[in-house]
Swiss-Prot record:
Pathway: Cofactor biosynthesis; adenosylcobalamin biosynthesis; adenosylcobalamin from cob(II)yrinate a,c-diamide: step 7/7. Its EC number is 2.7.8.26. The keyword Transferase applies. It comes from Methanosarcina acetivorans (strain ATCC 35395 / DSM 2834 / JCM 12185 / C2A). Belongs to the CobS family. HAMAP family: CobS. Keywords: Cell membrane, Cobalamin biosynthesis, Magnesium, Membrane, Transferase, Transmembrane, Transmembrane helix. GO terms for biological process: cobalamin biosynthetic process. This is Adenosylcobinamide-GDP ribazoletransferase. It catalyses: alpha-ribazole + adenosylcob(III)inamide-GDP = adenosylcob(III)alamin + GMP + H(+); alpha-ribazole 5'-phosphate + adenosylcob(III)inamide-GDP = adenosylcob(III)alamin 5'-phosphate + GMP + H(+).
Protein backbone atom coordinates (compact mmCIF):
# COMPACT_ATOMS: atom_id res chain seq x y z
CA UNK A 1 0.00 0.00 0.00
CA UNK A 2 1.15 3.54 -0.76
CA UNK A 3 2.75 5.08 2.34
CA UNK A 4 0.38 8.06 2.28
CA UNK A 5 -2.69 5.84 2.03
CA UNK A 6 -1.31 3.64 4.80
CA UNK A 7 -0.76 6.67 7.03
CA UNK A 8 -4.24 8.00 6.25
CA UNK A 9 -5.85 4.63 6.98
CA UNK A 10 -3.83 4.25 10.17
CA UNK A 11 -5.02 7.67 11.29
CA UNK A 12 -8.54 6.29 11.48
CA UNK A 13 -7.35 3.14 13.20
CA UNK A 14 -5.43 5.18 15.76
CA UNK A 15 -7.79 8.10 16.38
CA UNK A 16 -11.22 6.53 15.87
CA UNK A 17 -13.17 3.37 16.58
CA UNK A 18 -13.79 2.80 12.86
CA UNK A 19 -12.57 -0.78 12.22
CA UNK A 20 -10.07 -0.16 9.42
CA UNK A 21 -7.30 -2.20 11.02
CA UNK A 22 -3.94 -0.94 12.21
CA UNK A 23 -0.40 -2.30 12.38
CA UNK A 24 2.93 -1.12 13.74
CA UNK A 25 3.99 -0.40 10.16
CA UNK A 26 0.91 1.77 9.79
CA UNK A 27 1.58 3.58 13.06
CA UNK A 28 5.15 4.26 11.97
CA UNK A 29 3.91 5.78 8.70
CA UNK A 30 1.30 7.83 10.56
CA UNK A 31 3.92 9.27 12.89
CA UNK A 32 6.06 10.24 9.90
CA UNK A 33 3.03 11.94 8.33
CA UNK A 34 1.31 13.09 11.48
CA UNK A 35 -0.17 16.07 9.65
CA UNK A 36 -2.95 13.62 8.77
CA UNK A 37 -4.39 14.21 12.26
CA UNK A 38 -6.49 17.24 11.20
CA UNK A 39 -7.36 15.45 7.94
CA UNK A 40 -8.88 12.64 9.99
CA UNK A 41 -10.55 15.34 12.09
CA UNK A 42 -12.09 16.83 8.95
CA UNK A 43 -13.59 13.48 7.93
CA UNK A 44 -14.91 12.94 11.45
CA UNK A 45 -16.25 16.48 11.41
CA UNK A 46 -18.20 15.82 8.21
CA UNK A 47 -19.70 12.69 9.75
CA UNK A 48 -20.58 14.18 13.13
CA UNK A 49 -21.62 17.44 11.49
CA UNK A 50 -24.08 15.54 9.30
CA UNK A 51 -25.55 13.92 12.41
CA UNK A 52 -25.86 17.36 14.02
CA UNK A 53 -27.48 18.83 10.89
CA UNK A 54 -30.10 16.09 10.57
CA UNK A 55 -30.62 15.91 14.32
CA UNK A 56 -31.33 19.64 14.54
CA UNK A 57 -34.26 19.10 12.18
CA UNK A 58 -35.71 16.29 14.31
CA UNK A 59 -34.80 16.42 17.99
CA UNK A 60 -35.29 18.97 20.78
CA UNK A 61 -32.10 20.89 21.51
CA UNK A 62 -31.15 19.20 24.83
CA UNK A 63 -31.69 15.75 23.33
CA UNK A 64 -29.60 16.62 20.28
CA UNK A 65 -26.76 17.94 22.45
CA UNK A 66 -26.61 14.59 24.24
CA UNK A 67 -26.87 12.75 20.92
CA UNK A 68 -23.96 14.73 19.48
CA UNK A 69 -21.83 13.92 22.51
CA UNK A 70 -22.71 10.26 22.19
CA UNK A 71 -21.83 10.33 18.49
CA UNK A 72 -18.45 11.92 19.15
CA UNK A 73 -17.48 9.28 21.69
CA UNK A 74 -18.96 6.48 19.61
CA UNK A 75 -16.65 7.35 16.73
CA UNK A 76 -13.60 8.45 18.73
CA UNK A 77 -13.79 6.23 21.81
CA UNK A 78 -13.04 7.19 25.40
CA UNK A 79 -9.25 6.99 25.33
CA UNK A 80 -8.82 10.76 25.20
CA UNK A 81 -11.36 11.26 27.98
CA UNK A 82 -9.38 8.72 29.99
CA UNK A 83 -6.37 10.99 29.45
CA UNK A 84 -8.37 13.86 30.94
CA UNK A 85 -9.06 11.90 34.12
CA UNK A 86 -5.42 10.84 34.40
CA UNK A 87 -4.28 14.44 34.00
CA UNK A 88 -6.80 15.50 36.63
CA UNK A 89 -5.35 13.05 39.14
CA UNK A 90 -1.82 14.23 38.33
CA UNK A 91 -2.73 17.90 38.63
CA UNK A 92 -4.36 17.37 42.02
CA UNK A 93 -1.48 15.36 43.49
CA UNK A 94 0.85 17.22 45.85
CA UNK A 95 4.62 17.09 45.89
CA UNK A 96 7.42 16.71 43.40
CA UNK A 97 7.22 16.00 39.68
CA UNK A 98 7.91 12.35 40.45
CA UNK A 99 4.92 12.10 42.81
CA UNK A 100 2.67 13.85 40.33
CA UNK A 101 3.83 11.57 37.50
CA UNK A 102 3.10 8.56 39.72
CA UNK A 103 -0.46 9.83 40.23
CA UNK A 104 -0.72 10.55 36.50
CA UNK A 105 0.16 6.97 35.60
CA UNK A 106 -1.77 5.32 38.43
CA UNK A 107 -4.59 3.21 36.97
CA UNK A 108 -6.83 3.99 39.96
CA UNK A 109 -9.28 6.82 39.29
CA UNK A 110 -9.08 9.53 41.95
CA UNK A 111 -11.18 12.50 42.96
CA UNK A 112 -9.23 14.88 40.73
CA UNK A 113 -9.79 12.66 37.73
CA UNK A 114 -13.52 12.36 38.39
CA UNK A 115 -13.84 16.13 38.82
CA UNK A 116 -11.87 16.93 35.66
CA UNK A 117 -13.83 14.39 33.64
CA UNK A 118 -17.17 15.76 34.83
CA UNK A 119 -16.12 19.35 34.12
CA UNK A 120 -15.08 18.45 30.58
CA UNK A 121 -18.36 16.66 29.87
CA UNK A 122 -20.41 19.49 31.36
CA UNK A 123 -18.46 22.05 29.32
CA UNK A 124 -18.98 19.96 26.18
CA UNK A 125 -22.73 19.77 26.74
CA UNK A 126 -23.00 23.41 27.78
CA UNK A 127 -21.08 24.67 24.76
CA UNK A 128 -23.34 22.78 22.34
CA UNK A 129 -26.44 24.13 24.07
CA UNK A 130 -25.05 27.66 24.00
CA UNK A 131 -24.46 27.43 20.25
CA UNK A 132 -28.04 26.26 19.80
CA UNK A 133 -29.44 29.06 21.97
CA UNK A 134 -27.35 31.84 20.43
CA UNK A 135 -27.42 30.40 16.92
CA UNK A 136 -31.19 30.46 16.57
CA UNK A 137 -31.11 34.23 17.13
CA UNK A 138 -28.33 34.83 14.59
CA UNK A 139 -29.06 32.21 11.92
CA UNK A 140 -32.74 31.44 12.43
CA UNK A 141 -33.82 28.63 10.11
CA UNK A 142 -30.18 28.05 9.13
CA UNK A 143 -29.40 26.70 12.61
CA UNK A 144 -28.89 23.13 11.28
CA UNK A 145 -26.17 24.45 8.98
CA UNK A 146 -24.54 26.22 11.92
CA UNK A 147 -24.58 22.98 13.92
CA UNK A 148 -22.92 21.16 11.02
CA UNK A 149 -20.25 23.86 10.77
CA UNK A 150 -19.67 23.91 14.53
CA UNK A 151 -19.04 20.19 14.82
CA UNK A 152 -16.84 20.15 11.73
CA UNK A 153 -14.72 23.00 13.08
CA UNK A 154 -14.59 21.41 16.54
CA UNK A 155 -13.21 18.08 15.28
CA UNK A 156 -10.59 19.67 13.04
CA UNK A 157 -9.59 21.91 15.95
CA UNK A 158 -9.42 18.96 18.35
CA UNK A 159 -7.02 17.01 16.16
CA UNK A 160 -4.86 20.04 15.40
CA UNK A 161 -4.70 20.72 19.14
CA UNK A 162 -3.14 17.28 19.57
CA UNK A 163 -0.61 18.08 16.87
CA UNK A 164 0.10 21.49 18.42
CA UNK A 165 0.81 20.26 21.93
CA UNK A 166 2.97 17.43 20.58
CA UNK A 167 4.94 19.73 18.27
CA UNK A 168 5.98 22.06 21.08
CA UNK A 169 6.25 19.47 23.85
CA UNK A 170 9.01 17.24 25.12
CA UNK A 171 8.31 13.71 26.36
CA UNK A 172 8.47 12.68 29.98
CA UNK A 173 11.54 10.61 30.87
CA UNK A 174 11.08 7.00 29.84
CA UNK A 175 11.00 4.44 32.71
CA UNK A 176 14.19 2.41 33.04
CA UNK A 177 12.36 -0.84 32.29
CA UNK A 178 10.83 0.54 29.08
CA UNK A 179 13.13 -0.02 26.12
CA UNK A 180 10.91 1.43 23.40
CA UNK A 181 8.97 4.70 23.18
CA UNK A 182 5.27 4.69 23.97
CA UNK A 183 2.64 6.11 21.65
CA UNK A 184 2.80 9.51 23.34
CA UNK A 185 6.54 9.80 22.82
CA UNK A 186 6.18 8.55 19.24
CA UNK A 187 3.59 11.26 18.60
CA UNK A 188 5.86 13.95 20.03
CA UNK A 189 8.80 12.73 17.97
CA UNK A 190 6.70 12.70 14.81
CA UNK A 191 5.27 16.18 15.36
CA UNK A 192 8.13 18.07 13.74
CA UNK A 193 7.75 21.76 12.98
CA UNK A 194 7.28 20.87 9.30
CA UNK A 195 4.51 18.37 10.04
CA UNK A 196 2.90 20.82 12.46
CA UNK A 197 2.91 23.57 9.85
CA UNK A 198 1.39 21.36 7.16
CA UNK A 199 -1.39 20.28 9.50
CA UNK A 200 -1.94 23.83 10.75
CA UNK A 201 -2.30 25.24 7.25
CA UNK A 202 -4.68 22.47 6.20
CA UNK A 203 -6.85 22.98 9.29
CA UNK A 204 -6.93 26.76 8.88
CA UNK A 205 -7.85 26.38 5.21
CA UNK A 206 -10.77 23.98 5.69
CA UNK A 207 -12.12 25.97 8.64
CA UNK A 208 -11.82 29.44 7.11
CA UNK A 209 -12.63 28.93 3.44
CA UNK A 210 -16.19 27.60 3.87
CA UNK A 211 -17.06 29.22 7.20
CA UNK A 212 -15.14 32.51 7.43
CA UNK A 213 -14.44 33.91 10.89
CA UNK A 214 -16.76 31.42 12.56
CA UNK A 215 -14.28 28.79 11.47
CA UNK A 216 -10.90 30.47 11.87
CA UNK A 217 -11.25 32.13 15.28
CA UNK A 218 -12.27 28.95 17.16
CA UNK A 219 -9.56 26.97 15.36
CA UNK A 220 -6.85 29.38 16.47
CA UNK A 221 -8.26 29.49 20.00
CA UNK A 222 -8.11 25.69 20.21
CA UNK A 223 -4.44 25.72 19.20
CA UNK A 224 -3.74 28.31 21.89
CA UNK A 225 -5.55 26.16 24.46
CA UNK A 226 -3.13 23.34 23.62
CA UNK A 227 -0.18 25.59 24.42
CA UNK A 228 -1.78 26.62 27.73
CA UNK A 229 -2.28 22.95 28.59
CA UNK A 230 1.34 22.25 27.66
CA UNK A 231 2.46 24.98 30.05
CA UNK A 232 0.47 23.35 32.87
CA UNK A 233 1.85 19.92 31.99
CA UNK A 234 5.39 21.27 32.24
CA UNK A 235 4.60 22.93 35.56
CA UNK A 236 3.16 19.77 37.10
CA UNK A 237 5.14 16.98 35.42
CA UNK A 238 8.13 18.55 33.73
CA UNK A 239 7.09 17.20 30.34
CA UNK A 240 4.31 15.70 28.25
CA UNK A 241 2.90 12.22 27.71
CA UNK A 242 0.03 10.61 25.83
CA UNK A 243 -2.49 11.61 28.48
CA UNK A 244 -1.66 15.26 27.89
CA UNK A 245 -2.00 14.84 24.13
CA UNK A 246 -5.38 13.17 24.57
CA UNK A 247 -6.48 15.93 26.93
CA UNK A 248 -5.53 18.51 24.29
CA UNK A 249 -8.01 16.80 21.96
CA UNK A 250 -10.87 17.17 24.44
CA UNK A 251 -9.97 20.70 25.53
CA UNK A 252 -9.39 21.82 21.94
CA UNK A 253 -12.82 20.60 20.85
CA UNK A 254 -14.56 22.32 23.75
CA UNK A 255 -12.56 25.53 23.33
CA UNK A 256 -13.60 25.74 19.69
CA UNK A 257 -17.27 25.25 20.58
CA UNK A 258 -17.13 27.80 23.39
CA UNK A 259 -15.51 30.40 21.14
CA UNK A 260 -18.19 29.81 18.49
CA UNK A 261 -20.86 30.43 21.14
CA UNK A 262 -19.09 33.55 22.44
CA UNK A 263 -18.61 34.91 18.92
CA UNK A 264 -22.30 34.37 18.19
CA UNK A 265 -23.17 36.28 21.37
CA UNK A 266 -20.89 39.16 20.38
CA UNK A 267 -22.34 39.18 16.89
CA UNK A 268 -25.84 39.34 18.29
CA UNK A 269 -25.00 42.17 20.68
CA UNK A 270 -22.85 44.28 18.35
CA UNK A 271 -23.95 43.33 14.87
CA UNK A 272 -20.36 43.93 13.85
CA UNK A 273 -19.24 40.53 12.58
CA UNK A 274 -19.74 39.09 9.12
CA UNK A 275 -20.55 35.41 8.79
CA UNK A 276 -19.92 33.03 5.93
CA UNK A 277 -21.51 29.60 5.95
CA UNK A 278 -20.74 27.78 2.71
Amino acid sequence: MNSYLLAFKSGFGFLTTIPVGISMEGIDELMKKIYFYPVVGAVLGLLIGAIAYIGQLIFPDPVLAALIMGSVYYFTGFNHLDGVTDMGDGFMAHGSHEKKIKALKDTTLGTGGVAFGMLVLLAFYGSIRSIQDEGINVFGSNLPLLMFASMFIAEVSAKQSMLTIAAFGKPLPRPENQAYPGLGEMTINGATRKNFLIGFIFGAFVCFLPFGLIGLIPYLAACISALVLLNRSYAHFGGLNGDGIGTANEIGRITALIIIAVTLELSLNTGGLEWTLL
